[in-house]
Amino acid sequence: MVRVVLATHNRNKALEFQQILGDAVPGLQIVGYDGPEPVEDGITFEQNALIKARAAAERTGMIALADDSGICVDAMGGAPGIFSARWAGRHGDAQANLRLLLDQLADLPDSSRAAHFTATLALVTPEGETTVVEGVWPGRIAREARGGHGHGYDPIFLPDGHDVTAAELGPEAKNAESHRARAFAAIVPVLRALSRPGN
């Protein structure tokens, strides 16, 4: 069995990670991280994910998995991007963040509301070896918040191929196709290799 520390204090994110991984990696045990959160001063999702994973690997001496993710709106040059969690100024105020984004896009027609979620996962071993993968979930921004599932910007994100928001999809449907699901699909082979006997 291999233990991997999940470098996040975000309960919603940790739950989503557990749900997505499920039984995909036999012999893998995900453990929580209670160490200090490093300053995320990178300018890309990849840089911030690596900062978090390296800090957790160094502190725990374990393999660490971290993500950095956000929503990127084409008409805003990719913003909020890495600033998604603090778009309205205060980190973690999801309601204020999505209200501000809706206000900023209020005058845009539906044809100009393209957006995507990005999730970048970084896996770092105690020896400093790194693997970085990315998942992208294309869609568009709705005109109002809808749905009670999910978190963050889910209530205003309409995934391509759906007329419902990510928050209306429900956890199973969302976890089958979200940006994190796509990133996890790319990291699972690496985790499986690490959990094989002899590694």
UniProtKB/Swiss-Prot annotation:
List positions binding Mg(2+). Answer: D68
Descriptive protein name? dITP/XTP pyrophosphatase
Q: Name one GO molecular function term.
A: XTP diphosphatase activity
Give the EC number. 3.6.1.66
InterPro entries, per database record: dITP/XTP_pyrophosphatase (IPR020922), ITPase-like_fam (IPR029001), RdgB/HAM1 (IPR002637)
Query: Which family does the record claim for this protein?
Result: Belongs to the HAM1 NTPase family.
Keyword Cell membrane applies: no
Entries under HAMAP family matching the protein: Non_canon_purine_NTPase
Q: Which residues span the membrane? A: none
From which source organism is this entry?
Answer: Leifsonia xyli subsp. xyli (strain CTCB07)
